[in-house]
Swiss-Prot record:
Gene coding for it: kefF
Reactions it catalyzes: a quinone + NADH + H(+) = a quinol + NAD(+); a quinone + NADPH + H(+) = a quinol + NADP(+)
Descriptive protein name: Glutathione-regulated potassium-efflux system ancillary protein KefF
EC class: oxidoreductase
Stated family: Belongs to the NAD(P)H dehydrogenase (quinone) family. KefF subfamily.
Membrane topology: Peripheral membrane protein
């Protein structure tokens, strides 16, 4: 099962993420958990989130880039749900062997992330990749949709279909276990 942990603080203003979820939602074996819809008060049901993660084979953290990072509710979700003794540490094996993919949208182009002497966009994934690896997960190449503020509808739809195809490809590669 593919579990999408979706964190958009302003989903009503989303163009790219909305289309990505619409495409992903057409697939069987995909569960979407919209954190800002489920937890507008930021009071996360840790047991429910851990149960959802336990059902998943592939976990996707999907969100718009905010200040070169994840939205605040997704960070809080990580802090609460990926707990010691469950996700990592002594007896923390619940996520071991599962896969994690980062699906992120940005308003700027990929070159926008060439900051100083750093090599650009891939550097921004490092904390998320480190989190996945620390929890014993397999890190998959991220899915990034850039320039979403200036994309026309046709481009957004094409990118959302590309996202859907990534999920289909993963499902087909893992259908036998």
């Amino acid at each position: 099962m593919i579990l999408i942990i979706y964190a958009h603080p302003y989903p009503q203003h989303s163009h790219a993420n909305k289309r990505m979820l619409e495409q992903a939602g057409t697939l069987e074996g995909v569960e979407i958990r919209s954190l800002y819809q489920l937890y507008p008060d930021f009071n996360i049901d840790v047991a429910a989130e851990q149960a959802a993660l336990a059902r998943a084979d592939l976990v996707i953290w999907q969100h718009p880039m905010q200040w070169y990072s994840v939205p605040p509710l997704l960070k809080l979700w990580m802090d609460k749900v990926l707990s010691h003794g469950w996700a990592y540490g002594h007896n923390g094996i619940a996520l071991r062997g599962k896969s994690l993919m980062w699906a992120v949208t940005t308003g700027g182009g990929e070159s926008h992330f060439d900051i100083g002497s750093f090599p650009g966009f891939p550097v921004l994934a490092q904390p998320l990749q480190a989190t996945a690896l620390y929890c014993g997960m397999k890190w998959l190449p991220p899915f990034a949709m850039h320039c979403t503020f200036i994309c026309d509808d046709e481009t957004l739809q094409a990118q959302a279909r590309r996202y859907r195809q990534r999920l289909i490809d993963w499902q087909e590669a893992h259908q036998n276990g």
